[in-house]
């Protein structure tokens, strides 16, 4: 589908959202574009500096959302890069069952829509940045890419891409034993960062954090791990 950030469907409470997550507001030399895709399913936000040297698409991690990437957004803007972010299905402000996913191709399909939006409305070259699951989505997009079409990204930058999670063998075994009668489990907030204040914010202050994790994500992860292991060698440079 053709995804376009639609100014006719603004994000309710956007100013409060930006303040709460300490994201850059619009200024005289910084344009902020925010809205939903045409199907109203996905929230998209873009920051464009007065002089732009290219556009970065940021793909967030599992159970993350745009609001948690303020430091990265500001760093990219300081480099005169336009930043385009979106909340994946079931994450942040986007619609869908919280964090439920049957196949990573659902995330890749939405990424393709965002790429089309960037190519139509923002300056090139185009760069991809992916954190954890977001890194996996960018890799899957790369290995599934049709070589007849020019590859859209000038660079790929992956931050701890999700390729084989810690404790995966046990998680996988438990999933296949219980998937027919356990559809979600209580979320355990792990020490995923050295920043204790950030971890405390996730646990007790961020209203967009899910408290339960759908078990279907394990099945989707299992499919992805198998696909990655069996994929052909690719010489594209990744940073």
Language model: regions and residue ranges:
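Alpha/beta-hydrolase-fold enzymes
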Residues: 129-217
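Short beta-strand element of the alpha/beta-hydrolase
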Residues: 53-61
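Active-site nucleophile elbow and catalytic-triad environment of alpha/beta-hydrolase enzymes
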Residues: 213-236
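Catalytic nucleophile-loop/oxyanion-hole region of alpha/beta-hydrolase
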Residues: 62-68, 92-122
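Short beta-strand/loop motif that positions the catalytic acidic residue
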Residues: 239
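An N-terminal hydrophobic leader/cap segment in hydrolases
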Residues: 1-36, 40-48
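Conserved alpha/beta-hydrolase
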Residues: 73-97
């Amino acid at each position: 589908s053709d995804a376009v950030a639609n100014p006719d469907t603004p994000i309710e409470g956007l100013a409060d959202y930006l303040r709460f997550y300490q994201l850059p507001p619009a200024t005289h030399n910084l344009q902020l574009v925010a809205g939903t895709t045409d199907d109203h399913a996905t929230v998209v936000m873009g920051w464009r500096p007065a002089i732009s040297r290219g556009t970065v698409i940021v793909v967030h991690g599992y159970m993350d959302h745009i609001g948690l990437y303020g430091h990265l957004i500001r760093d990219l803007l300081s480099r005169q890069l336009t930043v385009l972010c979106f909340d994946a299905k079931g994450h942040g402000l986007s619609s869908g069952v919280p964090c439920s996913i049957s196949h990573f191709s659902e995330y890749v399909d939405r990424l393709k829509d965002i790429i089309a939006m960037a190519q139509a409305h923002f300056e090139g070259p185009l760069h991809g940045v992916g954190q954890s699951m977001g890194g996996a989505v960018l890799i899957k997009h790369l290995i599934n890419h049709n070589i007849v079409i020019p590859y859209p990204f000038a660079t790929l930058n992956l931050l701890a891409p999700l390729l084989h999670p810690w404790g995966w063998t046990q998680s996988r075994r438990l999933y296949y034993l219980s998937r027919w009668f356990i559809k979600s489990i209580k979320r355990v907030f792990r020490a995923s960062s050295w920043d204790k204040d950030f971890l405390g914010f996730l646990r007790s202050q961020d209203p967009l954090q899910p408290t339960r994790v759908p078990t279907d994500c394990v099945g989707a992860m299992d499919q992805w791990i198998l696909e990655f292991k069996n994929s052909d060698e690719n010489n594209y440079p990744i940073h």
